[in-house]
């Protein structure tokens, strides 16, 4: 989403957002909480990715709108099968106004755009889809069809077929935007406030990544979280 925001000029490299620990829409009573309830303070794009600042992405999603988010993420194969050479693959869900109308017979709401911006709400993706998208960022837009089978050979050994993944290039408007996202993902591991800094322990290779905010059931603003009063499957297991 950050990459799409940069490519479509919804934000600039110097853009920053103040995070008080929640995001609120005008004329909308609900607060959209950050995973860090005390807030991150003012963060730029690199810091927002490294620290996984939900408020930054709520705000960016609001600027972009669901139509632009849907179109941008479609390039990365979300909501579609990856072409993995195993049976039973599902495409997941990349929600849109049209998807919700068809599947829920309901209009799209502004709040749903915000949570889609952090990969929550109706959106679903498989681990292989996330790996595919991450690889596309690392390869500067080169999207490779994932393969499990390396090669096949006939019983008599006469024929040999090597599995070749197909590749597709995601349109690039500014390569510097892609470099910035890669640097931000490195800061997730190596930055002092990176959410995956614990992985930075005698690494023998350069690592980049991005953590996610788990989606849990909601509590009313006046309610307190008491694990004993909640079904075990809904409890915080972090």
Region annotations inferred by a language model:
Residues 3-238:
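Beta-lactam-recognizing serine transpeptidase/beta-lactamase-like catalytic domain environment
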């Amino acid at each position: 989403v950050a990459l799409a925001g940069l490519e479509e000029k919804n934000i600039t490299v110097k853009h920053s957002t103040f995070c008080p620990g929640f995001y609120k829409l005008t004329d909308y009573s609900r607060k959209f909480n950050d995973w860090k309830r005390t807030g991150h303070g003012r963060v730029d794009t690199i810091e927002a990715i490294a620290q996984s600042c939900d408020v930054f992405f709520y705000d960016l999603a609001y600027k972009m709108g669901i139509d632009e988010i849907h179109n941008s993420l479609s390039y990365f194969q979300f909501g579609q099968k990856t072409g993995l050479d195993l049976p039973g693959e599902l495409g997941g869900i990349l929600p849109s106004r049209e998807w919700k109308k068809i599947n829920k017979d309901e209009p799209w709401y502004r709040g749903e755009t915000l949570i889609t911006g952090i990969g929550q709400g109706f959106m679903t993706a498989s681990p292989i889809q996330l790996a595919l998208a991450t690889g596309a960022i690392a390869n500067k837009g080169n999207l490779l069809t994932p393969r499990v089978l390396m090669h096949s050979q006939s019983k008599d050994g006469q024929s040999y077929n090597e599995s070749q993944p197909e590749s597709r290039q995601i349109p690039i408007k500014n390569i510097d935007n892609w470099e910035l996202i890669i640097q931000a993902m490195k800061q997730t591991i190596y930055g002092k406030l990176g959410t995956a800094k614990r992985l930075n322990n005698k690494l023998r290779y350069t690592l980049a990544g991005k953590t996610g905010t788990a989606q849990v059931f909601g509590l009313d603003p006046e309610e307190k979280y008491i694990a004993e009063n909640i079904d075990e499957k809904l409890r915080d297991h972090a």
